[in-house]
Amino acid sequence: MQSKLALIQELPDRIQKAVEVVLAMSYQEAPNNVRRDLDNLQACLNKAKQTVNRMVTSLLDKPSMAAYLEGKPLPEERPTLEERLRKLELSREPPPTRSDPAPAKL
């Protein structure tokens, strides 16, 4: 059984082969409305091929995705910039002072 990583890596090639099969189809003798639909199918397949290529490249560039697909432990997530700034602000704030008298109990 192929690994998840190998399956993902093969996607662009598999789609390329499917697109080539459709592009090789001869349909010049088909009626105009059929030819137009098949032209649209070819355009769709070409766009799908480009989209899959970009997505696979993007996914495999992410260390956590590559580690998951290879079955390795995931790298620790780094805190976002907002989380780091919030921690920094909290560490620099002076402790609250009680200048107001405590509310009276009824």
Swiss-Prot record:
GO biological process, one term: symbiont-mediated suppression of host innate immune response
GO-annotated molecular function: RNA binding
Keyword list, A-Z: Host mitochondrion, Host-virus interaction, Inhibition of host innate immune response by virus, RNA-binding, Suppressor of RNA silencing, Viral immunoevasion
Gene3D superfamilies named among the record's database cross-references: ESAT-6-like (1.10.287.1060)
Localization, UniProt: Host mitochondrion
InterPro entries documented for this protein: RNA-bd_B2, RNA-bd_B2_sf
Renumbered residue ranges of the record's region RNA-binding: 1-73
Subunit field text: Homodimer. Interacts with RNA-directed RNA polymerase.
Note: Encoded on a subgenomic RNA (RNA3) synthesized during replication and which is co-terminal with RNA1.
Family: Belongs to the nodaviridae B2 protein family.
Domain notes per entry: The dsRNA-binding region is required for suppression of RNA silencing. The N-terminus is involved in homodimerization. The alpha2 helices of the dimer bind parallel to the stem of the dsRNA helix.
Function: Binds double-strand RNA (dsRNA) with high affinity. Suppresses the host RNA silencing-based antiviral response.
This protein's name: Protein B2
Originating gene: B2
